[in-house]
């Protein structure tokens, strides 16, 4: 048994300069596990609650001293003496201690910091890398990166309504080469923007944030960048889009202000389908708003057999909501964000449910990140086969990519890279 003897939390800053929670879990052996939690900009209404102080005199009300205090008092007292290797029991203890459906009393940010720190401490105690500790002997597969190279929506101060346009190196032979493909496309896009006199400033997730005449202009630019990098669109590098549709869904219509459009769910499905006909798009995330389940059904029936349809705000990493979606044949993939649900155990539950239903899983960062690399290990440990962790700039994003490079090196000849196969539904 590796008993927990202390838990210490602190307020640190994320990549947007906002406070977040970091926790240390100390074991009787002297081992320490440390983890920091991320924070989102566009959030689903049913996400677990991120506890903020609300004190406008500190960090514009975004301080997390209450969550930190909950870790240092109630949570610490509840888990001291527990075996750090019993992740499920530790997480369940914290869930019951909180006592709410959405973790609003203690804060999902408090619970998650401790949950991840416990896993790190347990891995360190076992003398194993985190991906191996969490996944056992099986993990050998690196995820396909979905790299957000044009930012819009809540992630950037520009005129693009859609939140992310991503490049996906489906034709690369390895993760290392996939990262190279992405980096070279990123730099090619920068040159294209620069030559056109457009801004090359970046958004929250490291992608460029230019003002463009239309969303299709973003797709055309990405195709040009892929070709400029000496790669083939659709063969070497495919495209993914995160619409984040909940952000522009009002009064039953999708308001695409940059193009002066107001579309019904059926019309918006036609809009997205036209993109898929013209461009090598293989993944669409949040193609409908989280509350528009009828729209999701229209979209799934229309595109679900040819495109990965990812539910982010739709499912919020919640197995109960995912179960309903599976029963109604809504979407075919789930985005996995650990802070949407608040513990690693519940995260594993959602991933396993998706696998059993033939849904794909995409491990994801948030727009407000830290140097914590847990999600890189999680992607390998769970054999998720896909990861979203931003563009090819900003060290908070590169930390995850670099960790995956290390894991690939450690796995050596046993490492594999699924490429396009990662986007085929299982079952």
UniProtKB/Swiss-Prot annotation:
GO annotation (BP), single: glycolytic process
Keywords, comma-separated and alphabetical: Cytoplasm, Glycolysis, Lyase, Magnesium, Metal-binding, Secreted
Catalysed reactions listed for this entry: (2R)-2-phosphoglycerate = phosphoenolpyruvate + H2O
Pathway the protein takes part in: Carbohydrate degradation; glycolysis; pyruvate from D-glyceraldehyde 3-phosphate: step 4/5
Top-rank taxon: Bacteria
A Pfam family of this chain: Enolase_C
Cofactor note: Binds a second Mg(2+) ion via substrate during catalysis.
Binding, (2R)-2-phosphoglycerate: 163, 337, 366-367, 388
GO molecular function: magnesium ion binding; phosphopyruvate hydratase activity
Needed cofactors: Mg(2+)
UniProt main location, coarse: cytoplasm
Catalytic residues (positions): 205 (proton donor), 337 (proton acceptor)
Residues engaged in binding Mg(2+): 242, 285, 312
GO cellular component, one term: phosphopyruvate hydratase complex
Subcellular location field: Cytoplasm; Secreted; Cell surface
EC numbers for this chain: 4.2.1.11
UniProt function note: Catalyzes the reversible conversion of 2-phosphoglycerate (2-PG) into phosphoenolpyruvate (PEP). It is essential for the degradation of carbohydrates via glycolysis.
Family according to the record: Belongs to the enolase family.
This protein's name: Enolase
Recorded name of the encoding gene: eno
């Amino acid at each position: 048994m590796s008993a927990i003897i202390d838990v210490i939390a602190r307020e640190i800053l994320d990549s947007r300069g906002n406070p977040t929670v970091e926790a240390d879990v100390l074991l009787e052996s002297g081992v320490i596990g440390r983890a920091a939690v991320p924070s989102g900009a566009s959030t689903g209404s049913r996400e677990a609650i991120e506890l903020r102080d609300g004190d406008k005199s500190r960090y514009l009300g975004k301080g997390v001293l209450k969550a930190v205090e909950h870790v240092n008092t109630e949570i610490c007292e509840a888990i001291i003496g527990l075996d750090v290797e019993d992740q499920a029991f530790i997480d369940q203890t914290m869930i019951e201690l909180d006592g709410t459906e959405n973790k609003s009393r203690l804060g999902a940010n408090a619970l998650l910091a401790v949950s991840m720190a416990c896993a790190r401490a347990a891995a360190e105690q076992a003398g194993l890398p985190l991906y191996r500790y969490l996944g056992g002997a099986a993990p050998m597969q690196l995820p396909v990166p979905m790299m957000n190279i044009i930012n819009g929506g809540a992630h950037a101060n520009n005129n693009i309504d859609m939140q992310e346009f991503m490049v996906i190196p489906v034709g690369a032979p390895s993760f290392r080469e996939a990262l190279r493909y992405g980096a070279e496309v990123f730099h090619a896009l920068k040159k294209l923007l620069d030559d056109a006199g457009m801004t090359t400033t970046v958004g929250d997730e490291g992608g460029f944030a230019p003002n463009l005449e239309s969303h299709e202009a973003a797709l055309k630019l990405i195709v040009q960048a892929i070709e400029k990098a000496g790669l083939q669109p659709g063969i070497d590098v495919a495209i993914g889009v995160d619409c984040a549709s909940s952000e522009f869904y009002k009064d039953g219509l999708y308001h695409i202000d940059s193009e002066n459009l107001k579309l019904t769910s059926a019309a918006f499905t036609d809009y997205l389908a036209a993109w898929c006909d013209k461009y090598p798009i293989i993944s669409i995330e949040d193609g409908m708003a989280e509350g528009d389940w009828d729209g999701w059904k229209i979209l799934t029936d229309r595109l679900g057999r040819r495109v990965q349809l990812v539910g982010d705000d739709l499912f919020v990493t919640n197995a109960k909501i995912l179960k309903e979606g599976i029963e109604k044949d809504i979407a075919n993939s789930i985005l996995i964000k650990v802070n949407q649900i608040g513990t690693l155990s519940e995260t594993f539950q959602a991933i396993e449910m998706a696998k059993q239903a033939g849904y794909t899983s995409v491990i994801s960062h948030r727009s407000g990140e830290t140097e914590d690399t847990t999600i890189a290990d999680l992607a390998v440990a769970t054999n998720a086969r896909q990861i979203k962790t931003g563009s090819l700039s900003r060290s908070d994003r590169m930390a995850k990519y670099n960790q995956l490079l290390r894991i690939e090196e450690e796995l050596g000849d046993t490492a594999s890279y699924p490429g396009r196969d990662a986007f085929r539904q299982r079952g």
